[in-house]
């Protein structure tokens, strides 16, 4: 049984008040003592709305006089005039980030964040969904009806992940599918996009989850340092190539890390050798830090460029040293991650911020924010440099154009 988050005391109604829902889903507040009603919460001053389909097993019908709606629980035969979705009513979205209240924290799990949500009809594309945080993200969304595209390199691993989800929720099997994507190859990204565009008309959630950590020095088939291409450049290319599948409902989630605060990229004259260094100047930890900074820079610039289209773009930190497959490349980090495991987030907790950014109603209309523990916070000063954001964008565009042209000849 999943433990639900504690009730926010600020959201509790004063004595004598109750919630009711209108036919269009707007929540009103009735003061039984004063015989008055209002559209805003008597304590928070916020308005709410019920959304989505009725919970499983409930149906809505008119009473015998045909004057008001009633609700029937077909399993228990319970009848009530109270809409069961009131328990999951959400605050109307705000354009002011200062008005967003923190509902979850570092202890919250992805499934807690999704409690009461119906995601049937939504489509999520998740890179690296076969293991770790990506798997828990996919699993949680699939449990709530979302269709999942497992964008992974390893077919057998992805299909095994889908099978585990199907064992827990058989109906989810038909909603999950694998599509081959190798982020170390721009050609693979191209083929992946071609396949997706033939089978999908719209993407609601693009979750750029995949990444690498602590790699020995290696180059991709495109000749770039692997950490940089896998963690940033291929995700950059993937996002722009999928642009026609996005609309004002789409949210793009970029997984970064607090490690972005320790990057050493220059603010001026950013060049390829800073991002994809030669072997003699390579340090795996700094390569990771710089790639994570690229993630935030990309998210900030993308949010700015696409803000008129209503597309929301968020970057986030999932948690420190979470026990995932990220540490697989070096024995020291595997040992270190194992030692600190009792003191870090579970994978369900680590996936919570990705899920929150993708689905939270209160984030509608907002973009360009950086999140940690399911709440926005300030990213590094360097990541907020408009000049560096634009330099990285231009460099990424030019680098991809050059590599794609080489591939065609």
From Swiss-Prot:
Record bears the keyword Zinc-finger: no
Broad EC category: oxidoreductase
GO BP, sorted A to Z: apoptotic process; defense response to Gram-negative bacterium; regulation of reactive oxygen species metabolic process; response to ionizing radiation; Wnt signaling pathway
UniProt-annotated catalytic positions: 288
Domain of life: Eukaryota
Key words of the record: Apoptosis, Cytoplasm, Golgi apparatus, Lysosome, Mitochondrion, NADP, Oxidoreductase, Phosphoprotein, Repeat, Wnt signaling pathway
Location (main, coarse): cytoplasm
PROSITE patterns: WW_DOMAIN_2
Binding site for substrate: 257
A Gene Ontology cellular-component term: lysosome
Positions annotated to bind NADP(+): 128-134
Region (Disordered): 1-23
Classification via SMART domains: PKS_KR, WW
Location relative to the cell: Cytoplasm; Mitochondrion; Golgi apparatus; Lysosome
InterPro entries: NAD(P)-bd_dom_sf (IPR036291), SDR_fam (IPR002347), WW_dom (IPR001202), WW_dom_sf (IPR036020), WWOX_SDR_c-like (IPR042732)
The WW domain, residue ranges: 11-44, 52-86
MF term (GO), any: oxidoreductase activity
E.C. no: 1.1.1.-
Role according to the record: Putative oxidoreductase. May control genotoxic stress-induced cell death. May play a role in TGFB1 signaling and TGFB1-mediated cell death. May also play a role in tumor necrosis factor (TNF)-mediated cell death. May play a role in Wnt signaling.
Family, similarity comment: Belongs to the short-chain dehydrogenases/reductases (SDR) family.
Name of the protein described by the UniProt record: WW domain-containing oxidoreductase
Lineage: Eukaryota, Metazoa, Ecdysozoa, Arthropoda, Hexapoda
Gene: Wwox
């Amino acid at each position: 049984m999943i433990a639900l988050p504690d009730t926010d005391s600020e959201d509790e109604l004063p004595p004598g008040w109750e919630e009711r829902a209108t036919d269009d889903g707007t929540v009103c507040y009735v003061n039984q003592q004063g015989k008055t009603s209002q559209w805003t919460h008597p304590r928070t001053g916020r308005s709410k709305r019920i959304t989505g389909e009725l919970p499983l097993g409930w149906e809505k019908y008119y009473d015998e006089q045909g004057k008001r709606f009633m609700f029937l629980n077909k399993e228990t035969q319970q009848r009530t005039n109270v809409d069961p979705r009131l328990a999951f009513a959400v605050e109307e979205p705000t354009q002011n980030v200062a008005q967003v209240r923190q509902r979850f924290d570092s202890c919250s799990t992805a499934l807690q964040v999704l409690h009461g949500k119906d995601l049937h009809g939504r489509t999520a594309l998740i890179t690296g969904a076969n293991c770790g945080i990506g798997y828990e993200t996919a699993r949680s969304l699939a449990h709530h009806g979302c269709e999942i595209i497992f964008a992974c390199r390893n077919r057998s691993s992805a299909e095994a992940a889908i099978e585990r989800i199907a064992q827990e929720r058989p109906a989810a099997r038909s909603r999950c599918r694998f599509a081959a994507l190798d982020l170390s190859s721009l050609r693979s990204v191209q083929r992946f996009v071609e396949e997706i565009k033939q089978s999908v008309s719209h993407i609601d959630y693009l979750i750029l989850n995949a990444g690498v950590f602590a790699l020995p020095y290696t180059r991709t088939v495109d000749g770039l340092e692997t950490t940089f291409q896998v963690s940033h450049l291929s995700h950059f290319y993937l996002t722009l190539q999928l642009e026609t599948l996005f609309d004002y409902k789409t949210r793009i989630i970029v997984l970064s890390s607090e490690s972005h605060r320790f990057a050493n990229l220059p603010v001026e004259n950013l060049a390829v050798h800073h991002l994809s260094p030669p072997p003699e100047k390579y340090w795996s930890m700094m390569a990771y830090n710089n790639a994570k900074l690229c993630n935030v820079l990309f998210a900030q610039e993308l949010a700015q460029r696409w803000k008129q289209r209503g597309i929301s773009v968020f970057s986030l930190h999932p948690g420190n040293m979470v026990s995932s497959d990220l540490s697989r490349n070096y024995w020291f980090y595997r040992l270190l991650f194992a030692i600190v495991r009792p003191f870090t987030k579970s994978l369900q907790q680590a996936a919570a911020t990705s899920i929150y950014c993708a689905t939270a109603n209160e984030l509608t209309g907002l973009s360009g924010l950086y999140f940690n523990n399911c709440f926005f916070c300030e990213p590094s000063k360097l990541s907020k440099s408009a000049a560096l954001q634009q330099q990285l964008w231009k460099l990424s565009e030019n680098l991809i154009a050059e590599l794609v042209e080489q591939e065609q000849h």
